[in-house]
Amino acid sequence: MYQNKDHTNQRHTVIKSNNIDISNQNSLLDITNKISKLIKKGDNLLLFGELGVGKTTFTRNLINQIQNNFKKNNTEVLSPTFNILNEYQINSLTIKHYDLYRIKQQEELENLSLFEEKDDINIIEWPEILKSYKIKSINYYAG
């Protein structure tokens, strides 16, 4: 399921529907293709779901679709579970892919410098610890 939630600073809505089927590869490619054409600098995508439900697969497809839009070769998109952050540069876009699964305390977040670069696109797996942040976001619930 893909759900869009409005937050105080949200500039635009990417998806207006509350439920989108991404249970198969064609559906996943369709939604990531749509998002890849609408996503803008400064957007935040928060990915919720249990282990193994497809958060990194969603991210991989989205980043590869953005690369395709810019006629760039697809790069390998891996889960940032151990290094917490993987960064991708696609022309003038900087995409930061975070996995906050191992972050347990708010103080640890401060070391990550989340949201400091207003033009970065942030894709965040396991964003539950961010509840104290007021950010504009698009939330993806898998599972």
Predicted regions and their residues:
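Hydrophobic anchor at the beta1->P-loop junction of P-loop NTPases
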Residues: L45-L47
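Short phosphate-coordinating micro-motif centered on Lys-Gly-acidic
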Residues: Y2-K5, N18, Q105-Q106, F115-G143
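N-terminal pre-Walker A segment at the start of P-loop NTPase domains
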Residues: N9-K34
